[in-house]
C-alpha cells in the first residue's frame, strides 16, 4: 500500500502513529521488550491518552533476529501460521544502556536508540546493514475503509539491490517494484505470481522474512526510493532479519528456519513428456509418442497424463475416463515395462457434474460460505467447489483416492492450481480466510507429498507443483506456470526461476517450448537446450503436442543431444541437488549468488549458474546471437573446449546444438558413463575433467550415491608444475581428462591417451602424480 504522498505528505484519509521515544526496556526470558510511545512521555501528564507500542526482539535460531511490533494485543490471531523451525534456548545477548538497548544473536544485533530521535538499527559485528529511522514504522489508520495496518521501512544503501519475494517474472532486481504477495493464476507475462513468498534478500548479505501468511504489500525502493517498505492489515507486524553474510549463507539460515528442499529421486532429473493440455489423446496417442521417442533414439524417463485422463467437467474425482482409457491399470503396467515413470495431473477442486460431488457436499468436505452454503463458481469447471483441506476427514478422502492411483502404478502427481482461493468463506477449522488464501498452496501440496511419502517412500517422492507459500520448498519440484511460446516468455521464465531460487526453492522447471500457442521450430530448439540444462526438464504444451518431430528433424537432434548431455552430467547435477537439500542453495542460481563480490553480476538475469561450477547462457534469438558475462578467472566451454577470460562480457553466435556453457577454473567435474538414463551407478566408469587448475589451488569433486551421500571423493592439488590426484571411497574404472593439456612431462601410477579435449589419464589405483 502507498502510505506517503511524496516526501512531505501522506495519502488522503490516512492517520499515522509512530514509535518515537523509548519509555521502558525489559528482559523477559530470552526476549528484549521495548515499550515505545508516539510522543515525549517523560512527564506524567503526557502518559495519558496515548498509544504505547510493544516491540519484542527474539531469536528463533542463531543469526536470526525476530521483531514483533504490537499495537492492540487483544486482536484475533487465527491461523494458519507459517510452519517455522523455532529453537528453544538460542544463545542471545541483551544489553541495556543509557543510550540504547541491544539484542544480539550470533553476529547479528538489533539496537534501539533511547535518545530524542527514534532509530532501530540492525548491525553485523557492530556495522550497520539496515534499519529504520524516525517515522519509518508504526500504525496506519485508513479512514477510507476503516482498516488498520502496521508497516516498517528498512533502509537500502547506495548500490543495494533486492531479490526474491517468490517466483516473479518481472525484472530480477526488485528495486522500483510494488509487490503484493497474493497468489494468482496470472501466467508468466504479468506482475502476478503463483508463488508469493514474503521474503527478500539483498546484495548486502542479509534477508528479511515477513511472518504474515495474508497479503503483505511491499514497496521496494518505489514509494521511498532508498527503503523497502512492507505493510500488513493487522494490529501487529512480525518480521525476521536473517544474517548471511553471503547470499548462500542467508538461504542456508532461511531454509533451516522454514524447511529444506527435499531431495528429488534421481529419475526425476530425466526428460518428462506430456499429453499436453487440451489436445486429443488416448492410449494409442500416448504409445505413438513413446514409441516415436524410442524409434528416434530420444531418451525418455517420465510420461505425464494431463487433465483429460479424467472425464470432462468432473475434475478432480480421480476416475479415469473409461471411453478414452478403458484399461488404465493395464496401460500403466505396459508403460512401466518400457522403463517409464508415470505422472498424472490433479487439482484441489471438484466439478459439480462428478458423481462424487453430492457425497463430498453431504460429508462437509467442500469449502463453504459463511452462511453454510457451498462456495461455487463456473470458472475452470461448471459449479466448481474447493476441497477443504482443514477438515481431516476431507484430507483422508482425498489421500485415499491418491493412494489408489499409486497402487495402480502412478509414481507422482502434478499438483496444479491452488491459487484462486476465495476469502468470502468459512473454513472447517476456523482459519482466517485472508491467511488461508496463500497458505492453501502449502497444505494442498503437503497432503499430496505425504501420500507419496507414505506409499513410495520419501526418497521416491516428487511433485510437479504450480502454487506455493512459505515452506512449500519442502515439496519439490515447482514449475513456472503458463508461458507463451516465444523468446520473451522464455526469458520471463528464466527470471521466475532465478527469483524462486532466491526465495529458498532448490528445484525448478518450466514448460519447454512454451505452453500457450505453438512455437516456431527455432524457439522450440533454443528452449530445449535451456530446459535440459535446468534442474528438471518437461516438454508440455496447451493445444498442441510437444514431441520434437512435430517441429522438424533437427528438433529431434537437439532433444537427443541435450538429454544425453544431462544424463552424463548427473554425477555433477545430483551432487548439487544434494547440496540444495542440505543447505538450501538452489541448483539453478542467479550469478550474484555465486559471485556476490562481483558487482557486474547484480543485474544479470539472462544467464545463470547450474551448480557451483557451470555457467549457462540460454540463446534468445533465432540467429543464435548471445551476450554473456563471465566473472574473474579462466573459463572453458564444456564440450567445445574453447577458453575465455573472465571479468568481461563476451558476444557469440551458436547453432542449435550449442549455447554458452562454461566451466570455471580450478574445477574437477564428474561426467557419467550413461547417456540414456539419469539414474545409474555414477561412480563406475566416471570421467573426471580437470579445468585450468592453478598453482596453489585444490579442486575437489564428490560423486554421490542415489541417496545424496558421497560415495567417492577425488582431489587434485597443484604445487608448481606438479598435480597430485587422490581418491577416497568407492569408484571403478575412472579416468581423468586434463582439459586443453596435450602432453605432460611426467606421470606416475597411471597411463595416458590423447583426446580432442585433452590428455586422458587412467590410474592404476586411486592416486596419480602428474608433472606438467
Q: Which positions does each model-derived feature cover?
A:
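Short, well-ordered beta-strand segments enriched in hydrophobic/aromatic residues
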Residues: 34-36, 57, 69, 102-107, ...
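Beta-sheet entry/capping signal
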Residues: 64-65, 109, 119, 198-199, ...
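Aromatic- and carboxylate-enriched substrate-binding clefts and catalytic-loop regions
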Residues: 70-72, 81, 299-559, 594-598, ...
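Catalytic core of carbohydrate-active enzymes
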Residues: 449-462, 468-479, 492-496, 500-510, ...
Amino acid at each position: 500500500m502507498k502510505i506517503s504522498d511524496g516526501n512531505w505528505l501522506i495519502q488522503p484519509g490516512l492517520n499515522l502513529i509512530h514509535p518515537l521515544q523509548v519509555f521502558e526496556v525489559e528482559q523477559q526470558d530470552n526476549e528484549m521488550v521495548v515499550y515505545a510511545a508516539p510522543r515525549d512521555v517523560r512527564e506524567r501528564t503526557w502518559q495519558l491518552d496515548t498509544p504505547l507500542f510493544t516491540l519484542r526482539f527474539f531469536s528463533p535460531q542463531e543469526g536470526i533476529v525476530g521483531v514483533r511490533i504490537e499495537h492492540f494485543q487483544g486482536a484475533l490471531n487465527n491461523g494458519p501460521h507459517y510452519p517455522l523451525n523455532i529453537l528453544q534456548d538460542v544463545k542471545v545477548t541483551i544489553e541495556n544502556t543509557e543510550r540504547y538497548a541491544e539484542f544480539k544473536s550470533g553476529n547479528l544485533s538489533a539496537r534501539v536508540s533511547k535518545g530524542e530521535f527514534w532509530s532501530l538499527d540492525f548491525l553485523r559485528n557492530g556495522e550497520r546493514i539496515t534499519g529504520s529511522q524516525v517515522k519509518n514504522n508504526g500504525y496506519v489508520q485508513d479512514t477510507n475503509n476503516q482498516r488498520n495496518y502496521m508497516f516498517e521501512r528498512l533502509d537500502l544503501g547506495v548500490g543495494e539491490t533486492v531479490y526474491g519475494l517468490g517466483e516473479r517474472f518481472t525484472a530480477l532486481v526488485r528495486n522500483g517494484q510494488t509487490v503484493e504477495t497474493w497468489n494468482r493464476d496470472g501466467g508468466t507475462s504479468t506482475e502476478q505470481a503463483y508463488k508469493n513468498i514474503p521474503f527478500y534478500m539483498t546484495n548486502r548479505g542479509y534477508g528479511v522474512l515477513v511472518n504474515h501468511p495474508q497479503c503483505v504489500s511491499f514497496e521496494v525502493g518505489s514509494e521511498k526510493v532508498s527503503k523497502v517498505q512492507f505493510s500488513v492489515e493487522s494490529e501487529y507486524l512480525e518480521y525476521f532479519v536473517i544474517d548471511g553474510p553471503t547470499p548462500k549463507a542467508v538461504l542456508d539460515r532461511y531454509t533451516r528456519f522454514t524447511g529444506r528442499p527435499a531431495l528429488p529421486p534421481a529419475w526425476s532429473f530425466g526428460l518428462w513428456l506430456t499429453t499436453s493440455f487440451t489436445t486429443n489423446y488416448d492410449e494409442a496417442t500416448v504409445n505413438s509418442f513413446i514409441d516415436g521417442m524410442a524409434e528416434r533414439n530420444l531418451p525418455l524417463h517420465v510420461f505425464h497424463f494431463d487433465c483429460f485422463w479424467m472425464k470432462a467437467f468432473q475434475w478432480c474425482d480421480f476416475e479415469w475416463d473409461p471411453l478414452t482409457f478403458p484399461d488404465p491399470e493395464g496401460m500403466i503396467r505396459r508403460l512401466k515395462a518400457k522403463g517409464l515413470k508415470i505422472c498424472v495431473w490433479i487439482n484441489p477442486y471438484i466439478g459439480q457434474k462428478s458423481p462424487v460431488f453430492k457425497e463430498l457436499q453431504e460429508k462437509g468436505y467442500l469449502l463453504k460460505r459463511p452462511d453454510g452454503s457451498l462456495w461455487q463458481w463456473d470458472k475452470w469447471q461448471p459449479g466448481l467447489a474447493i476441497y477443504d483441506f482443514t477438515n481431516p476427514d476431507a484430507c483422508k478422502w482425498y489421500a485415499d483416492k491418491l493412494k489408489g492411483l499409486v497402487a495402480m502404478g502412478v509414481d507422482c502427481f502434478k499438483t496444479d492450481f491452488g491459487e484462486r482461493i476465495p476469502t468470502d468463506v468459512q473454513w472447517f477449522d476456523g482459519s482466517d480466510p485472508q491467511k488461508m488464501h496463500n497458505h492453501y498452496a502449502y497444505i494442498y501440496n503437503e497432503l499430496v507429498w505425504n501420500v507419496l511419502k507414505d506409499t513410495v517412500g520419501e526418497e521416491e517422492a516428487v511433485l510437479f507443483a504450480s502454487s506455493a507459500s512459505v515452506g512449500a520448498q519442502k515439496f519439490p519440484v515447482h514449475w513456472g506456470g503458463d508461458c507463451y511460446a516465444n523468446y520473451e516468455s522464455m526469458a520471463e521464465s528464466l527470471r521466475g526461476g532465478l527469483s524462486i531460487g532466491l526465495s529458498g526453492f532448490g528445484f525448478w522447471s518450466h514448460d519447454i517450448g512454451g505452453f500457450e500457442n505453438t512455437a516456431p521450430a527455432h524457439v522450440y530448439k533454443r528452449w530445449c537446450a535451456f530446459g535440459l540444462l535446468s534442474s528438471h526438464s518437461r516438454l508440455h504444451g496447451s493445444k498442441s503436442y510437444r514431441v520434437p518431430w512435430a517441429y522438424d528433424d533437427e528438433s529431434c537432434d537437439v532433444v537427443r543431444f541435450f538429454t544425453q548431455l544431462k544424463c552424463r552430467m548427473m554425477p555433477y547435477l545430483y551432487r548439487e541437488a544434494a547440496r540444495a537439500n542440505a543447505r538450501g542453495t538452489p541448483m539453478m542460481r542467479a550469478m550474484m549468488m555465486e559471485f556476490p563480490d562481483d558487482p557486474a553480476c547484480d543485474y544479470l538475469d539472462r544467464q545463470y549458474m547450474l551448480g557451483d561450477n557451470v555457467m549457462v547462457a540460454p540463446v534468445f534469438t533465432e540467429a543464435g546471437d548471445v551476450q554473456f558475462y563471465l566473472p574473474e578467472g579462466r573459463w572453458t566451454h564444456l564440450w567445445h573446449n574453447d577458453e575465455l577470460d573472465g571479468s568481461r562480457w563476451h558476444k557469440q553466435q551458436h547453432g542449435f546444438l550449442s549455447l554458452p556453457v562454461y566451466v570455471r577454473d580450478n574445477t574437477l567435474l564428474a561426467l557419467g558413463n550413461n547417456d540414456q538414463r539419469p539414474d545409474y551407478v555414477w561412480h563406475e566408469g566416471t570421467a573426471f575433467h580437470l579445468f585450468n587448475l592453478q598453482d596453489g589451488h585444490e579442486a575437489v569433486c564428490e560423486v554421490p550415491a542415489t541417496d545424496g551421500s558421497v560415495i567417492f571423493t577425488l582431489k587434485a592439488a597443484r604445487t608448481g608444475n606438479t598435480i597430485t590426484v587422490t581418491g577416497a571411497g568407492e569408484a571403478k574404472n575412472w579416468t581423468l581428462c586434463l582439459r586443453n593439456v596435450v602432453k605432460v612431462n611426467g606421470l606416475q601410477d597411471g597411463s595416458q591417451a590423447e583426446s580432442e579435449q585433452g590428455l586422458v589419464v587412467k590410474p592404476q589405483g586411486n592416486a596419480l602424480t602428474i608433472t606438467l
